[in-house]
Structures are given as structure tokens and as C-alpha cells.
Amino acid sequence: MFSLNPQSNGNSNNLFGNVTLGNFSNNSNNLFGGSSTTSTNTNNSNNLFGGSSTTNSNNLFGSGGSSTTNNNNFNSNFNNNNIKNENKIKNGKKFYNFRWSPTGEILLYNTLNNFDNHNFDQKNGGSDTIRYEMNTTLSTIKKFYNDLYTNFETMQRIAGLSNQVIPDDRVREISHHSRTYLSVILAAINQMSKSQKTGSYIDDEDSCMNCDPLDNDLIKIQTPRVLEYFKQYPNKTLIFFCGSIDSIYPYLCSKLSMETKSKCILIARESNVPNSKRLDLIRTISNQGELKILNKDEYSNRYQIANENYGELDDVLTLEIDDTYLAYEREIDNLICMSTMWRVANLFYFSVSSSSNSVSPTQLLDCIELERKELLNSIEQQGTQDPMDSEYYNQIARLLVCGCIDQVIQQLNILSRAPRSASQIKSTSRKSPINLLIDILSSIPLKKKSINGGGGAPLYPNEHLIQWNKWHQETQKILSQYIESGSSSTNQVDENLLPIVKILLGDQQTIMSTCNSFLQLVVSNILFVEYTTSTTQLRQLFTQCYQTIQAPTTVDKIFLSFATKDLDITLKKIFKHSPAWLAVHLSDLLYHHPYVMRKLPNSESQLTNIREYLLSDFGQSLASDSSLLSIGCNYLKYVKNGGLEMIDQFISRQPIHFEKNAIKMLDKWATSVETKNSIYKMLSLQDFKRKRYAASLNWLMLANDNSHITLLSNYLLENQLNSEFLNDLQSLLEKNDEIDCNINNNNNNNNNNNSNNRISGNNNNNMIIDENKFEITNNSELIFLIRYRELISLWKERSFKEYSSSLCLMFKDRVIPKRFWLRLLIDCVPLLESLKNLYFTYQDTLLLQSCLEEIIQSHLFDQYSFNISNQDIQILRSALARNLAKSIIS
């Protein structure tokens, strides 16, 4: 009763396209388009999306370049679903001829737009060709990107509220957002430094969890780097901190130690999920060398433990070998550098004081805050030094040029208590030189401000300038007297103190020799040479200091460009040499600034194009990483020219592993009908693979894809008419609340009642089909599938009278494809032969007889009668004749 399986010949509309091992045959209708062969394109294929691809020419965007697919039609796992059906069907049933993007992701259709190469100066901003670069991103950096975007989005929301905002109010908003960005950067630095120190990154990063200690590919990649340590330190005992015991490094270091005959000690953290295989590996490593496994708390103090256990050994060197640890180290270094750039930008453009053309020394000191911390940490690690050592004085000089006044005073106090200092000559004020220096530094306005005002505004405009000028004059007077007193025959100036004195006197040569960076040189000139509060004078000072540097770095050039107002050049340099996020968020704040790169506060910014470009590039780079797709699309939605199109392209090319994720993408990001339909089709692919045929059909109905619904319906009628599918189909129809299951299928009569029957309900996830609703009346195969399901239900319920009426109505309305006529007519024989009831009237019987004669006289009768014997047809003829006679008598 339920087996409608006529033979499918080579010219039939095959759901998957007629596929052979090396070639796609002609005249095939491929369900999801994209016909291809190993060397040439197939003729007469029904390609839904237009265009075709060969194995050697699969151009993603239609302009330049090519992508090789390498027999891509056999890379699909979907092909495995139909192996069982190949015995029934003459031609192999394959589901989908794949084309692929360069990253191996599914590519369903050609891009909507060609994104040619653009530059910063384009009128409409523009963007580069879509890139597909899959990057491994640290979990902490992902969180950092999310925090950056939160602030970015807030800025866009505020900027979009009103274009007539008071310029000074906008400056204050931008200043606040600049400080927020900086706090996000500093928080990321602190968090990553803490994770690095304690080893908690092992629990946070995907690369450290569920890793394989015998991953041959990773071992092959890391071997040259680890081997270099053994070659570089052949005579030392190396202590390797390996991260997790589950990583490759305990095994790799042990193996290389045996090969190079070097001595090494391995320290690793315990496994999160120990198993027998790892335990065997640990025993093997322990037998080859020394392995120490620490718990989480112990590993956070690994350096102390290493010192306690191995501190007495000679020529010991500790090394962090874990690549994730080193990745953290690189990111921290980058963030430190980027935070300094941000501080300099904030100094000139984003602080409220910069808009009033004034700066304070504390703002300059903020620019080298991380340098100061690094210097203080290095001094702390070195421990207490001998005050009699000349290096002690050099240390004080370095602290002084960094503006660490409190630490300098502390060091001088220690020095004053040393025996040698007690015998120092007295100045005219009867104080030792060290005490003189302490008094001078204690009176510096920088300290007075922190004590009195706590960063508050001065009482009158030139208060700070007057205070600093007075301090400079007093310093010059006192220290000049000290040097003059040391020039006599009885007194001598302490040579160790002389560099410190010269720095306080503003000696440029001494300052330059002591400073380690460009910004330290600028800060020293402000503090000890010529104090200024003018932004204009500060810009000039930046230029002067830059000219004194013999070999300026790229970072120094970027600092200078901030001072010279060449913001387009600045942003290009940052974009070229720094992570893209820095240029993007700087350009955004500068773009919204009413006094930067604008003729008038409310006029269009000259940075519009470069901001557009940077947003586009950054959004694409994020969206290329599937784990950052959402945030990448968030940025792209603010790209005015082509942003939504780029989102559609990225969304449509995302591999869909879970239906929930697809629904989320549809709900949040898919903006065009083409993108939604491509996702529906990918979901249909997945459900077909899982043999969820009703759900697969439902996705195609959501996509309003009539041609594919026809092909899928035909396939299901030929191969999958089992009770499980019919039950699923019933469930599908019940979930679509506007389906009229009693459809009048006479499409030739233009019945108004039937033309209004649409599927517009919800799928399994309550997703609404928008304006693109599917018309059931446009698809006769689906109508027959639905009506045939009704027939099955009536038969199972033993409602034979209703069954016969419905069947005759279907024959009358020509709903049933001719290849199924004989099978359905033969299924009626038990009802025709019934002795108790008359199920077919006289008119019904004549209709069935005419259908039988029509199919017998058809030139395709041999095809329609496949697997049906002549005896079955004769039995049907006799049953119809007897029923006709019975109907006349009745």
C-alpha cells in the first residue's frame, strides 16, 4: 500500500543531480545548484544561483584570483545518506554538489557586490575584498574585544541622539569614553598579567583544555622553537615551566633532552581531567628525567618552589615554554604599547583640558605610567643595593627622569644615613647636598598638587605656571651655589650626585643620556627644563625632542604624528603597525570630536572616509573568526557603504552546526531575503543528512523555494514514504497553523479560495516567515504529498468511504503524477472487490477506468508500469468491471 517506487531513469528530475564517480551527467536538476565536474562544466544543468564552477576555477567574487575545489563534489558527508537507495534507483542519489570558500566553508551563492580594492581617500570610504582569515584568538582578547565594543556602541548611540549637541558637551562625552577605553585596556593588561603569573590561563584558554599531549602536528610545529633553547644553553640545567601536564611540552622537552643529552627539569600543573593514558605518559616522562607536577596553588608560586628545590644547583636557568604563556606575553606587550599611544592621543585630543589648550604635568606622567611601573618593579626585583655603589645613584637618576619623585626622596633618605654621606661637605645653608636635594624635591609643585588639590583645578589660570617658575628659580639658585662651593680648593662636588644635580638644573645632555624613551625625554624637559601648560608649546617640545633622537622607532614616529596634527597619517601608521582595534576606536572618537578635522563643529568630519574604511576592515577581520562573528557583524552594521551586504556574506558562509545558532543568526543578522534563504537551505541540508525529511521540507518551505520543494517532494514520494516520515509530515503540517489540508488542487481553475492558502506559521523554533510566504498551490508535488498523507491516514483509520472519495477527487483534479496512477489504482482493488460495501459509485468507477486506459495508452507506459505485472493490470480491469456492474445494480 505504501510503496510508490517506480524506477527512476537517466532523464528524470533527480533530486540530487545524476552523479557518477567522476562526472555529473547531463539533463540533471541539482537540488541546491552548482553543478560541476572534475574538469568541465555539465551541460543543461539547472543551477539555481546562476554561474558554475570547475575544479580549477572557482572565483569567489568574480574578479581576480581563483580557488581550487579539488573534486569538491565528493567531499560532502551528505552523500552517505543515500547508499541504501542506490540499489533501488538506477542513478546514484547525491544530495548536493558543494562549492567551497577559501577556508573550506560552504559557499552557496556568488557575492552580491564586488568589493574592489579601496584606499583611504575614496569618496565613499569603501572596503577591501572580503577576507576569510581564521585566527586563533585568546579568550581574554575576545572578552577585551567585547568590552571595547560595548563602549563603542554607547558612543554611537549617544552620537545618534542629536546632531545639534553643544560642542563642549560632546567634548566631555568623548573625554569620558576615552578614559573608559583606557580603563578597558589597562584592565586587560592587569587580568592577563595576573593569569600569566598564577597560571590560571590554563583554565581559561581553549588551547590548554582537552589538549592531546601526543599531538604530532603541534609537536612538529613547536619542536624547532624548543630545540633552540637546548642549543642556546648547552651547559646549563634548564628548568622548563610547561603549563598543563596535558600539553605537549612535558613529552616534547623530555624527548629533546634525551636526543641532545642535555639536563632539564620539567615543572607542570596537574591535569584537569586525568586518565590512564596520561598517567602512562607521565610515568614514561618521569623515567626519562625529572618531572615535578604541582597543583593549582603551587603552580602559581612555581618560581618560589623552583628556587627552594633547585636553587643550590649551578648554572640553572628557568624558562616558560608554554606557547599560550608566550602568547599572553606578546599580547601584554602589545597592550602596554597601545595604552601609551592612547594616553598620548588623549593628551592632545580627548582630555577636557586639551580643548582649552592646556595640559598638566600629571597628564604627561600618565603617558609613562607603565614605564614607571616597570622601572619600579625591576628595582624591587634587584633588591636593596649598596648605597656606596655608583649603580645606586644611576638608579636614582632613572627614577628622577621618570617623575618618580617620592621614590627618589626615599632613596636619598637611605643614602643620607650612609656613613659616607654624613661626612659630606655642607652648603651655605649648612645642609648636606643630599638633604638639599631632598628639600628641593619635596617642594616640587608636582607633589604640592597631589597633596593640596588632588588633581583639582587651580585657583586662578596661571597658578601652576607661577608655582613651577618659582620652583625652577629656587632650584637653580640653591644648586648653583652648591656647585660653586664645590669648585673651591677645600670642597669637592660628589661625582655620583652630579648627574642628579644636572638633571634638576635642566642639563639636556645629562637628561638625554639618562632617558630610555622618547616620552621620558619629553617629561624630563617639562619637569626640569621649561615647564609649560600650553598644548601648542607641548607640540613644539615633542618635535624638538624627536629631532634629538638618533634612531627613532616607529612608535616614536606615531607619538610625533599625534603632536603634528597629521591625523590621517597618524591613523594610517597605527593601522599599519598596530592592532586594528586601536586605529578603529581612535578614529571613531576623532570622527565624533566637534573641534578635530572639521571646518565647523557641526560640519562633516574629514575623517569620515578613513573611519569607514577602518570599521569595514576591522569588522571583516573579526567576522572571519567564527568565534568573533557576532562582534564583527556588530561593527560592520555601522559601515554605511556596504556594511549590511558584508554581514550577509559572512552570515551566509558560516558553517551551521546547530539549529539554535542558525536561528540566532537569522534573527539578529540576516537582513536580505537571499541570505535568509541560503541559511534555510543549509538547515535543510543538515536535516536531510539526519533523515529528518519533514523538517528538511519545512526549511525549503520557509525559503519559498518551489523548485527544490518539487525535487525533494518527488524524492520523498519515490524513496521515503514510510510511516515515520508521514508522522513527521503530519507534525509539520500541524505546526503551520494556516495550512488547509483539504486543498482544492485544480490549479487550472484559478480558485480564489485555494490561491489564498499559504504557509505562514512558525517552525519548530517559532521563527516567523516574513513577507516571502510560500504558496502551497504553486507546488503540485507538495500538494500531492500532503493529500497522499491524508489517504494513508484514512486507510489506517479504515475510513474506506472517505478514502475512495478523496482518491477519486485527486484523480479528477489531476493532482496525482501519472507515474503513481497504476500503483494507486491497484491499491484500490480490495475496495473494488468488497462484497459488503460499495465504495466507488458509478461515476467514480468510470473515472478510474478512464484513468487506467489513459495510462495504458501512454507512450511512457513501460516506465509507469515498472515492477507491475500484466496480471496485476488484468486483475484491476476485472475489479473495475465488477464494481461498475455492482454500482449499476445498487
UniProtKB/Swiss-Prot annotation:
GO terms for cellular component: nuclear membrane; nuclear pore outer ring. Pfam families: Nucleopor_Nup85. Residues 59-84 have a biased composition (Low complexity). Sequence repeats lie at residues 16-17, 32-33, 49-50, 61-62, 618-619. Residues 16-619 are annotated as: 5 X 2 AA repeats of F-G. The keyword S-adenosyl-L-methionine does not apply. Its main location: nucleus. InterPro entries: Nucleoporin_Nup85. Residues 59-86 are annotated as: Disordered. GO terms for biological process: mRNA export from nucleus; positive regulation of DNA-templated transcription; protein import into nucleus. Transmembrane segments: none annotated. One of its GO terms (molecular function) is structural constituent of nuclear pore. Residues 719-752 form a coiled coil. It is found in: Nucleus, Nuclear pore complex; Nucleus membrane. Keywords: Coiled coil, Membrane, mRNA transport, Nuclear pore complex, Nucleus, Protein transport, Repeat, Translocation, Transport. Contains FG repeats. Belongs to the nucleoporin Nup85 family. Component of the nuclear pore complex (NPC). NPC constitutes the exclusive means of nucleocytoplasmic transport. NPCs allow the passive diffusion of ions and small molecules and the active, nuclear transport receptor-mediated bidirectional transport of macromolecules such as proteins, RNAs, ribonucleoparticles (RNPs), and ribosomal subunits across the nuclear envelope. Due to its 8-fold rotational symmetry, all subunits are present with 8 copies or multiples thereof. Component of the nuclear pore complex, a complex required for the trafficking across the nuclear membrane. This is Nuclear pore complex protein nup85.
